[in-house]
């Protein structure tokens, strides 16, 4: 696809960007490269490819573990704790 001044001006308007005159030729070149890459992707023959629709990550069983020493250590890092909970300032009236 050819990127001309009219198309670049339209893209500027749609994107609400202003491209300085000294950068316009460079931007047109970069856009042409991107569109060329997209055209290559569209040209790929994918009709006969087998798709893997059942890909998933196997789940592990959740096994609760009681580790009270970890909770005590975490609560000890805070200056304000009470009855195994963090005490924080009231933020909702």
From Swiss-Prot:
Keywords: ATP-binding, Ligase, Nucleotide-binding, Protein biosynthesis. It holds the Pfam family GatC. Gene3D superfamilies: Glu-tRNAGln amidotransferase C subunit, N-terminal domain. Coiled coil: none annotated. The keyword Ligase applies. Belongs to the GatC family. This is Glutamyl-tRNA(Gln) amidotransferase subunit C. It comes from Helicobacter pylori (strain J99 / ATCC 700824). The gene is gatC.
